[in-house]
């Protein structure tokens, strides 16, 4: 076990303890540095940054050339086209309801398009074939 010695009573105390049984309080390095920075007069660094903030990603300045402008325009046009058309996203889908609605709409459109150009003779032939298939299915169910 790691221990430290108390400066008042020279007793060995575990490192994790913040105080000694004799009453001495160990000051952590963080608190020590915070107190020292409060005592010191504000320097140029301390004035501009009174609170310590998390660092952010540094934004680089871009050199604006014709090539960069073309690339930016392409990116913008792609993002606009992608937002209009439904594109498949990464990861697990949140809900599948939109996909089902799209599939139903497509099916309805396809059905309307398929039978719009059908002649009367072809429709009759298909209806006879469909009636034959239905009759066979019904006969199979009766046997089972």
Swiss-Prot record:
Give me the stretches of Polar residues compositional bias: 35-45
Coiled coil recorded as keyword: yes
Q: Where is the composition biased (Basic and acidic residues)?
A: 63-74, 99-112
Q: Where is the composition biased (Basic residues)?
A: 50-62
Q: Where are the stretches annotated Disordered?
A: 33-112
Enumerate the Pfam families for this protein. UPF0547 (PF10571)
Q: Which residues form a coiled coil?
A: 94-122
Coiled coil as a keyword of this entry, yes or no, is yes
Keywords on this record?
Coiled coil
Which InterPro entries does the UniProt entry name for this protein? C16orf87-like, UPF0547
Recorded family membership? Belongs to the UPF0547 family.
PANTHER family the record matches: UPF0547 PROTEIN C16ORF87
Q: What is this protein called?
A: UPF0547 protein C16orf87 homolog
């Amino acid at each position: 076990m790691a221990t430290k010695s108390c400066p008042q009573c020279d007793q060995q105390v575990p490192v994790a303890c913040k105080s000694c049984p004799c009453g001495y309080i160990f000051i952590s390095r963080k608190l020590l540095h915070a107190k020292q920075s409060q005592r010191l007069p504000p320097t140029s660094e301390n004035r501009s940054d009174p609170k310590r903030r998390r660092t952010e990603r540094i934004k680089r300045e871009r050199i604006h050339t014709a090539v960069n402008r073309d690339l930016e325009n392409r990116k913008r046009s792609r993002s606009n086209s992608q937002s209009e058309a439904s594109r498949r996203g990464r990861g697990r889908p949140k809900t599948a309801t939109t996909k089902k609605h799209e599939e139903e709409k497509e099916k309805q459109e396809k059905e309307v398009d398929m039978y719009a150009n059908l002649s009367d003779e072809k429709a009759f032939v298909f209806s006879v074939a469909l009636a034959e298939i239905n009759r066979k299915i019904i006969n199979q169910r009766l046997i089972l």
